[in-house]
Amino acid sequence: MKPNEKNTWQLAQPVLLNLFREEEERWRHDPTTVLPAFKRELLDAGFEFELLHQSLNYLPACIDVVLPIAVKYFCLSTSINEKQYIRNWFSFRGCTLAVPPLLHEIEENMDKPSWCWELGDTLLRIRDESHAEEYLAIVKDKRYGIGRQNLVLLLGRIKYAPALPILIELLNDQEAALQAMTAISCFKSPDHIRYLEPFLSSHDPDYRKQAEKAIARIRKAAK
């Protein structure tokens, strides 16, 4: 299989190629890494590339073939750094096979809010509506801290109505209030403007700006 030519410029620069070669050379000295096996399985599946990162050029066109392989090695890896890298292969709309392991990873890493934030970002890109209850359960749990932010946005993006009472509550949560404003505006209901208006006079410019944007979005949809 040939890669998507329009994406190959990203890896054509010699400096970038050398960096990726050096990285793959380091794999030889790490017996715990799953990345060589991941690369081998993609090559065995018929993809043509020199460096693992170049296989991203096949996406999203060949996602049906790549997704099960990528999810397999995401689950096998014991390294957060590796998992951060592997999730690049399924950060696309519709990669629903990746959702359960991503959610499991969040639940196992409650004490790592930045990592949970990144996992939530991947879930936001995938946008699978069938796990809305699980997203909401995480969003409701303040122990995840900022790790909830992208799932708050996701609940708005998929317009999950049962989440609305929680989203309104989150307007008083400093770790998720800005995202809650955006999520509430996704429902485009004029009835929700009253929850956002108090923030127009906030001392925090970020709150004022986000409230203005959210209200404007609702009013535009109502016209």
Task: Go through each PLM region and give its residues.
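Core helices of alpha-solenoid repeat scaffolds
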Residues: P31, L35, V66-L67, V99, ...
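Terminal targeting and flexible regions in eukaryotic proteins, enriched
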Residues: M1-V15
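Short intrinsically disordered terminal tails
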Residues: M1, A222-K223
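Structural detector for internal amphipathic alpha-helices that build alpha-solenoid repeat scaffolds
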Residues: L11-H29, R40-C62, K72-L76, N81-C95, ...
